[in-house]
Amino acid sequence: MTAMRTISEPENLALGSSLPPGDPHGVSVHLPKWADTVGWASRELRVLEAMKTGYPRFFVPRVVDRLATLLLERQKSELGDRGGNEKQAILLNSAQHARLCREALRRLSLPLERGEPPDIGVYIVTWEGRITPVPPEGVTNHPWRARAVGEEDILLVTFPVDIYLAAKAFWQHTGFGVSSRRAAYWLDNAPFLVPDVAPKALTSPAERVKQLNGGLDALKKRIAAGHSSPSDNLLVSLSDVFLFPAGMAAIAQTAAAIKCLRPEDSPSPPRVAVFGFLYVDTNKVLSRVLGYEAVQYHSTPASLDALEADLEASSRATGADPTATSKRLDLLVTEFPGNPLLQAPDLERLGRLARKYGFALVVDDTVGTHANLSLLAHCDVVCTSLTKMFSGACDVMGGSAVLNPASPYRDRLGRALECGRAEAEERAWFWEDVVRMERNSRDFSERVHRASENARRVAGMLRRSESVSEVYYPLGSPTQDWYDRYRKEDGGYGYLLSIKFKTPAQAVAFYDALDVAKGPSLGTNFTLCCAYTLLAHYRELEWAAEYGVVEDLVRISVGLEETGWLEERVGRALMAAEKLDEARG
């Protein structure tokens, strides 16, 4: 297996270590104790100072931070210091990303004390170090010069320090930020950043083009084949597959394209139904960044009934008064299965509602994967975070959106996404990241099947423990029948599971005693555990609990290790939790 890499002795890793260990581009970080997760969530100095890296959307890579600082200093010296040292900056990959960022920051940020809107600057930084300001109307109309692969311009977005949190939220929710590989490449090779150093022997421009195009083509073929379904008479072509620098970027740009399909003179904001408890940033990118009016539904039959009743009421109101469009639904987003509760929605009924009431149905299959499930024939778009099990190596970011060729949205949505394809695939996704993703994913299906079998065994162990109140896993869940409808003949039940212990103390004891890698992300070749709710919803614990996502939930992304290795470590951690139960008794 080309991408199989596990961690044999994770108990020896220190707090803040990169995951994978020693990898400068690792996309997770080790948080060995429950208290470390609390410390990260509460921004405890002890934990922050130990962090060598982190999940790139939650923790700006230090190499990216260094490049942003240098480019901001250059912007100040060349174009004048508007605001002096009170400015900060983030680095984005494309003009479309910069436009969305400027719009979002102005919408999200409260006016500054002087009563003026925040001064958001957008600048094009070339490989040679030229910096050009871009006016608001010019961000999408800039005549981009052809650039050698790897030397594409970077977008520098500057803002007052007092709206840093809004800018950081944009970075986190969208996945539009430059990658650690792009930043390192610039710091090592851009002529204005290393003027006194002899140039390195770089890969030739022709070879970079060959590697980029070859990688993109191979990825599209792999993804298209995985989503094609002869039993559904569904053949996915390469033109139906769109690639992005992150999974959230795939969701953000798909939702933005759907938003663009609305009439320009529509008097109401776009509306999205969020069905089930979805990944933390999906909700936020839809509402906070893209301006959708979001309606949240539980993933239950009763909530599905409520959704249908709302749609019917809106349809009747619109029929009676054609101008009454405020409740019309444009989009419904769901996960199959959900993260972290692994519930499977009734996709067949959602699809019928989508056709009847005229909204787009987008499914995130990151947890289920196209190796286990055939979902595309039953929705309009499937979005995937390729960062997770598709890569598996935990060292590169990427995302995809695949259009159902039989969808009524195929042509219009395809045209909307096609307009930005070159920018998304050839500019925004750095060529070294594309090459890494292609190499990592060659044995994707084999790894999914192995991890799914390991997870099935671990779920069984956990369900037999007296300290465990509930195990959330598709096999044996109340929604297994819905999962099984779309499970491939050789498909399993996935690599992800979550655990609710009988007491919070038992959850802490289990987590602390479990000798595996611990930190954010999922779908890694090595087993990865996290205190999910603390990482994702620390400042909204009560709201999360309303959906069953309790504060002491433990989530495990099961990896490719030998089954005996896993069972021995999970068994020891369960013993630690069970001892607390015995002590109470």
Question: What is the predicted role of each segment?
Answer:
Residues 216, 220-245, 316, 460-463, ...:
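Hydrophobic, structured segments
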Residues 512-542:
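Conserved PLP cofactor-binding pocket of PLP-dependent enzymes
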Residues 2-249, 257-263, 270, 275-295, ...:
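Conserved N-terminal alpha-helix of the aminotransferase class I/II PLP-enzyme fold
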Residues 480-489, 531-552:
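Active-site-adjacent capping/gating segments
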Residues 26, 43-47, 200-207, 416-509, ...:
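Structural motif of enzymes handling amino- and sulfur-group chemistry
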Residues 237-464, 472, 584:
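Conserved PLP-enzyme active-site core in the AAT-like
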Residues 569, 573-580:
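C-terminal alpha-helix
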